[in-house]
Amino acid sequence: MGFLVFHVFQVLKIRRFLEQMKETDIVKAIMKYLRTVPGCFCWKEHGGMYGTAGIPDIIACIDGRFFGFEVKTDIGKPTKLQEATIRKILAAGGTALVVRSVDEVRTAITDSLH
């Protein structure tokens, strides 16, 4: 029984690692795209012990408009804190959402600025 629990834990750990790798790739692709957008200032928010919990992964200001992009894989879900932060950004007049691709970011920017 102990081995089975250990094995399941290892499988879940590996799955999370692979998901993180993919999320990292999505973040890199989005950052690469945002650097081509005229009038865009953006940065990757670093989590961990020195970051602020719940802040979207990517912050951008485009032509004076605030954007917060919480990046997730196809199976990833935002935490309750991330959802609350997105609601606060929206209430303050910014744009914030969960994105899973560069195309979703492109659409959000286009919809917001036009």
Residue ranges and their predicted role:
Residues 2-114:
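Catalytic phosphate/metal-binding cores of nucleic-acid and nucleotide-processing enzymes, i.e., regions
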